[in-house]
UniProtKB/Swiss-Prot annotation:
Gene3D superfamilies per record: 1.20.5.3310
BP GO annotations: protein transport by the Tat complex
Protein name (database record): Sec-independent protein translocase protein TATA, chloroplastic
Bilayer-spanning residue ranges: 84-104
Species annotation: Oryza sativa subsp. japonica (Rice)
PANTHER family (UniProt xref): SEC-INDEPENDENT PROTEIN TRANSLOCASE PROTEIN TATA, CHLOROPLASTIC
Membrane topology: Single-pass membrane protein
UniProt family annotation: Belongs to the TatA/E family.
UniProt subunit comment: In thylakoid membranes, TATC and TATB form a large receptor complex, containing about eight TATC-TATB pairs, which binds the precursor protein. Twin arginine signal peptide promotes pH-triggered docking of TATA oligomers to TATC-TATB receptor complex, inducing a conformational switch of TATA that results in activation of the translocase. TATA dissociates from TATC-TATB upon completion of translocation.
Residue ranges that the UniProt entry lists as topological domain Stromal: 105-170
């Protein structure tokens, strides 16, 4: 997997470190080259470094979203897999190598087991939480609200009120 060379063009402005292409066709060709670099699975950081600016980053991100929006395309390629927290295969290999150097080969299996147990407990807690939410939504959604007590008067209260008022007036 090789990288495409970045061409520079002579420029009259000295304020910019990047030179502008002499015509619009060359600009479209450069944008297509950046899109190929992004579609090849390079990270956006690397493609913005190759193109030399934030404008290239926007083009690379747009090209990546267009390339990944197809029905069967899943960002393939050996270097294109962003597996965990945006880390690719090379980053994970470096992290594993540093961990092997720091902890040593005897402690690595123990550390791996403890990390696995922690991840398993988090997954179990998430499943329990999800089942509780489903259970609550199933219980509360189908039943009508409980009936409220309504005061039904049979006329007995009115007779008592009349009797008490007549006693007071006497």
């Amino acid at each position: 997997m090789g990288m495409a060379p970045v061409a520079t063009y002579p420029s009259s402005s000295s304020s910019s470190t990047l030179a502008r292409p002499p015509c619009a066709a060359a600009g479209r060709a450069a944008a297509a080259g950046r899109a190929r670099v992004a579609a090849a699975g390079m990270s956006s950081r690397a493609s913005s470094f190759v193109t030399g600016g934030a404008g290239g980053l926007a083009v690379a991100v747009a090209a990546r979203t267009r390339a990944g929006s197809g029905a069967g395309s899943r960002g393939g390629g050996a270097m294109g897999c962003k597996c965990l927290f945006g880390l690719g295969v090379p980053e994970l290999v470096v992290i594993a190598g540093v961990a092997a150097l720091v902890f040593g080969p005897k402690q690595l299996p123990e550390i791996g087991r403890s990390i696995g147990k922690t991840v398993k407990s988090f997954q179990q807690a998430a499943k329990e939480f999800e089942t509780e939410l489903k259970k609550e939504s199933d219980d509360g959604g189908d039943q009508p609200p409980p009936p409220t007590e309504t005061a039904v008067s049979d006329g007995g209260e009115e007779k008592e009120l009349e009797a008490s008022s007549s006693k007071e007036s006497t």
